[in-house]
Amino acid sequence: MTNRKAIWGVTLIALFAFTTAGCAKMGMSKASGDKLNKIHFDFDKSDIRSDQAKTLKGNAKWIKANSNHKVSIQGHCDERGTPEYNIALGDRRARAAKSYLVNLGIDADLLKTVSYGEEKPDCKKADEECYAKNRRAEFKK
């Protein structure tokens, strides 16, 4: 019996480490049920990518369960483009995320949108990996 407990304990520790590292690398939380997660966009696009749908569905579930909170959807861009263009693109991204959530049954009155354009980068390096991290919409309680 002791060996089983030891194996089970090691398995849980390994699973936790793997999950934590993997989620951090992807910019996700370990437990999507207790946190709103950001979504990402392709270069110069505001349409919701199919690989971001699961994140939005998780966010919708959280918002439905916590309808006493209003959520701000913040649109962001990478540094390429003029500040004016990026403010408009960030706005389109935030509105696209809001529209998706409304289509999932979220009350539009619980959601507000704002664009920060390129002003609040997640990553400050001038390379494609950072640009991809900065093309996002964040959801704040």
Model-predicted segments: where are they?
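Extracytoplasmic/secreted proteins, especially bacterial periplasmic and envelope-associated proteins
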Residues: D51-G58, E84, A88, R92, ...
